[in-house]
């Protein structure tokens, strides 16, 4: 389950160089875009290098928001794509403000200046709204974000009206600016007008709903065709039922066989509360595709799993799909009181049938918070963690200090 607020994803390997190398293609893509922009503007119109960088950065912001599989692969995770997306958006604002002040106010033709001012006002407003996002309903927040596209169009008008023939005759500068502008426009158009219509090819309906405890439901979905995913991944789910917002929300897959999928959802926000209280069997749903790089199957033979509360779902998915465990696994599941724990019977039964599955249940009310100061982590193990971000950061430091050779992968979600 992915908690509703801002989206955060972290995959941390204790070998920092390996971690960097896994995202190298994405990092190179961003750096190369900026370097090419700097070199091209310096060679032709160096006085406009700052707004040129702002235009490239804005174009990249739209491109990174498309959730394209290629970008997720380049950055080794959708969450890291979003982190860079936020960076390019913020950088764009800084560059535009600097451009405005350095020029003594936007100048050129009166209309061109007005387009530029409109773009900056909208961008700054969106940034302020983004910081106030937790106080705004998600659907309203999503629609307000679309104003960025309008500001981007105003900004393009401003650039082309100011630059005139330098961008309207074929040369390296016009090719660079035109290419990034076109990619940004296409990306924004896809996000706003096409993604919701063509980006969800898996169509199905809810076939069963099960209350697991006082605030958690398991949703069973049957799809018209198999959904390709691996244990540990998540998907964006749209629910077509009166009273539900039309926007997709991400949830971890907690099991299934391709056409039948399970999602476990905790009541922790407006949308998830609506799911817990009002979702009905028979409602239509759609999915886009599988995301995520916390893929348990790719880990080493010795593994340590660590989970907190509702974030057990990626591990439940693996357990359901692998009744016979072929790895050596130590699983630490932390929860606050058994009434808040999930799938305890399934875990105990799995441990009984698989002697290489070592189960540790940690009730923080009785046992205190889970820590690894006195617990041993096998030297060459892969450690998977999925839980509250504060818990994972604390445990990551403890494990890193104890065993620098461990491969540590953790995933945490918040989504606005």
Predicted regions mapped to residue ranges:
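Membrane-helix interface/capping segments
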Residues: 65-78
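N-terminal membrane topogenic signal
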Residues: 16-30
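Juxtamembrane/interface segments at transmembrane-helix termini
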Residues: 71, 136-140, 192-202
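FNR/FR-type flavoprotein reductase catalytic core
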Residues: 26-29, 84-192, 259, 268-416
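Ferredoxin-reductase
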Residues: 196-286, 335-337, 348, 363-365
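Short, hydrophobic transmembrane alpha-helix segments
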Residues: 38-48
């Amino acid at each position: 389950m992915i908690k509703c607020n801002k989206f955060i994803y972290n995959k941390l390997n204790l070998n920092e160089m390996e971690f960097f190398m896994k995202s190298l293609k994405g990092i190179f893509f961003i750096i190369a875009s900026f370097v090419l922009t700097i070199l091209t503007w310096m060679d032709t119109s160096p006085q406009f290098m700052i707004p040129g960088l702002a235009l490239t950065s804005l174009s990249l912001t739209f491109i990174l928001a498309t959730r394209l599989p290629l970008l997720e692969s380049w950055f080794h995770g959708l969450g890291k794509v979003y982190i860079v997306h936020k960076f390019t958006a913020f950088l764009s604002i800084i560059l535009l403000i600097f451009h405005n002040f350095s020029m003594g106010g936007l100048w050129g033709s009166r209309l061109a200046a007005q387009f530029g001012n409109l773009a900056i006002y909208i961008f700054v407003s969106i940034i302020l709204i983004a910081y106030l996002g937790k106080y705004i309903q998600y659907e309203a927040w999503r629609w307000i974000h679309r104003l960025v596209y309008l500001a981007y169009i105003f900004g393009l008008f401003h650039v082309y009206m100011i630059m005139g023939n330098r961008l309207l005759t074929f040369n390296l500068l016009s090719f660079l600016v035109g290419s990034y502008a076109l990619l940004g426009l296409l990306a924004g158009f896809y996000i706003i007008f096409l993604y919701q219509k063509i980006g969800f090819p898996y169509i199905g309906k809810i076939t069963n709903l099960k209350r697991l405890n006082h605030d958690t439901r398991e949703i069973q979905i049957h799809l018209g065709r198999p959904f390709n995913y691996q244990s540990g991944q998540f998907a964006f789910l749209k629910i077509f039922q009166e009273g539900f917002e039309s926007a997709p929300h991400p949830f971890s897959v907690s099991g299934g066989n391709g056409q039948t999928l399970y999602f476990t959802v905790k009541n922790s926000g407006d949308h998830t509360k609506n799911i817990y209280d009002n979702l009905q069997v028979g409602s239509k749903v759609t999915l886009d595709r599988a995301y995520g790089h916390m893929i348990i199957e790719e880990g080493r033979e010795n593994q340590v799993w660590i989970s907190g509360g509702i974030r057990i779902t990626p591990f439940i998915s693996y357990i359901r799909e692998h009744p016979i465990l072929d790895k050596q696994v130590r699983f630490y599941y932390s929860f606050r009181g058994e009434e808040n724990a999930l799938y305890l019977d399934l875990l105990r039964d799995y441990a009984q049938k698989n002697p290489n599955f070592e189960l540790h249940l940690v009730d923080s009310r009785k046992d205190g918070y889970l820590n690894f100061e006195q617990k041993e982590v096998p030297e060459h193990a892969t450690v998977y963690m999925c839980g509250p971000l504060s818990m994972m950061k604390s445990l990551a430091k403890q494990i890193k200090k104890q065993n620098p050779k461990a491969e540590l992968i953790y995933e945490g979600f918040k989504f606005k």
